[in-house]
Amino acid sequence: MRYLFVALAVLLASTLVSAQAPAPVSGPLTRHYRDGETLTYRMTATNEDWHYTADVSGTAKKTVNGSTVEEFRWTGMTSNGQPIKLTPAMAQFRENLSLDPNWTPSAPDMGKTDPKMSGPILDFMTFYVDLWLVNKVGILQHAGDHFYVPNPQTSSWADGNQVIVGKDQIDFDLNLQSIDPVKQTAVVVVHHVPPSHPNLQLPAEWMQAPVADTANNWVEVKKSDDGKFEAGVGKETFDVTIIVSTADGRILSASMDNPVVTSSRTCDDAALTKCGVPQPHTIHRHIEIALVH
């Protein structure tokens, strides 16, 4: 099963914004934390032919520098309708996330997690860091406001073993789509789009040709068990929609659509020069979270 670690790109963008953004302004999306507050979410996801659910609960607590963080623990998972027993390491694993603009996001230690949970952990982080990014920028105050964040950096999910190369590059279009004063909710939409001129270092000449209607911004090379190389290139986008409580800034629900339009070849050599015919393919993931209590 192929994981697309889009959350890592969001972290890179958050680093850039942290260095450039002015002090955040309180607005309709501001998170008002209560120390000890606990939130529980249910994630429902489809990754091509794989369907899964996962449950996560987090408790708010103050950090030593005065910001607030939510310490999340993953409590359960089902795969294609069947309960999955998580590894003992997951009982100790904590995922620290926050919507406090004074906090700086960081990647979790994935070496201490159950491999089956990589997708849920990183996708959940994407929802949080996307909204954190909106709060950090601090200028989305009214329905229709938007802000574009160019991202010159690439993110990588290569592990050096099976995944030899795994990179993407995306820009961010932040939008405050609507505010409902009666329901006390706001709709935030974050479009993750290819840069006009990605600076990906593509490992083969045949990867330069655009697969879709933009320059390629996604590349992956995996080594198969028979010693061959599965190489693909293409266009990745994803759209995140977040329903936010304007009363306290909590995420009430969210969804993410993540299509990748690719062209892949099976190659005999690591230089990717002795390859078979191109095979078009579209990878599609859809993830939703909902606040349970």
What label would you give each PLM region?
Residues 1-4:
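Positively charged n-region of N-terminal signal peptides that target proteins for export
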Residues 20-293:
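Signature of exported/secreted
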Residues 6-15:
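Bacterial N-terminal signal peptides
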